[in-house]
From Swiss-Prot:
Intracellular or extracellular location(s): Cytoplasm
Alphabetical list of PANTHER family matching this protein: CELL DIVISION PROTEIN SEPF
Entry superkingdom: Bacteria
Pfam families: SepF (PF04472)
Major location (coarse): cytoplasm
Subunit structure: Homodimer. Interacts with FtsZ.
Record keywords: Cell cycle, Cell division, Cytoplasm, Septation
GO biological process, one term: division septum assembly
The family this protein is said to belong to: Belongs to the SepF family.
Single GO cellular component term: cytoplasm
Described purpose of this protein according to its UniProt entry: Cell division protein that is part of the divisome complex and is recruited early to the Z-ring. Probably stimulates Z-ring formation, perhaps through the cross-linking of FtsZ protofilaments. Its function overlaps with FtsA.
Protein known as: Cell division protein SepF
Organism: Synechococcus sp. (strain CC9605)
Length: 188
């Protein structure tokens, strides 16, 4: 008795040695016969040409294919919210979870409640790997990860123009002109 036979005898018991387990019929033999019959009828090329490579078995009852949540052919949706209290903030989080962009106009709220609301929605946005951007005074944009937010005019808008009332007309023109670029200031 070989080593492998001994291991089989120990693991499977004596039934394996009697050959009773070899009597089971397997479906593999039937599949091999069907494959040979198809090749004999038209060859391998005929079976490939007759089948539709894009047929995913849609005619099968009870298909297990489930669409991905949030992926649709519909246009992107933007929710503009003007909350009056912090109690309305969960609606903003729910909209973000539904992959909708949210613009919060917090001018109607008290400053401390507005700060709390921004912190709450910013935390929810961070949790879903989203983006946040300040659009204006007390106006914020929150977007899910499927939306790309770019800000091209932020540097130009952040440089305020300062004009003093006591300055003469020549100084006003100097202050009112566009600021010089940062890379040119070092050369002066």
């Amino acid at each position: 008795m070989s080593l492998i036979s001994r291991l089989r005898a120990v693991v499977a018991g004596d039934d394996y040695l009697d050959g009773e387990l070899d009597d089971f019929a397997y479906d593999d033999e039937q599949d091999d016969q069907d494959q040979r019959a198809l090749q004999a009828d038209g060859g391998a090329l005929a079976t490939i040409g007759d089948s539709n490579p894009f047929d995913l078995g849609g005619d099968l009852p009870g298909s297990n294919v489930i669409g991905m949540p949030g992926i649709s052919n519909a246009a992107a949706e933007v929710n503009v919210m003007e909350p009056r209290s912090f109690d309305e903030m969960p609606r903003a989080i729910q909209a973000l979870r539904e992959r909708k962009t949210v613009i919060l106009n917090l001018t109607m709220m008290e400053p401390d409640q507005a700060q709390r609301a921004v912190d709450f929605v910013a935390g929810g946005t961070f949790a879903i790997d989203g983006h946040q951007e300040r659009v204006g005074e007390s106006i914020f944009l929150f977007a899910p990860s499927c939306v790309t937010v770019t800000n091209t005019g932020h540097d130009e808008a952040s440089a305020p123009t300062v004009v003093s009332r006591e300055a003469d007309a020549a100084d006003v023109d100097e202050y009112a002109s566009a600021p010089s670029p940062a890379w040119g200031a070092a050369a002066l």
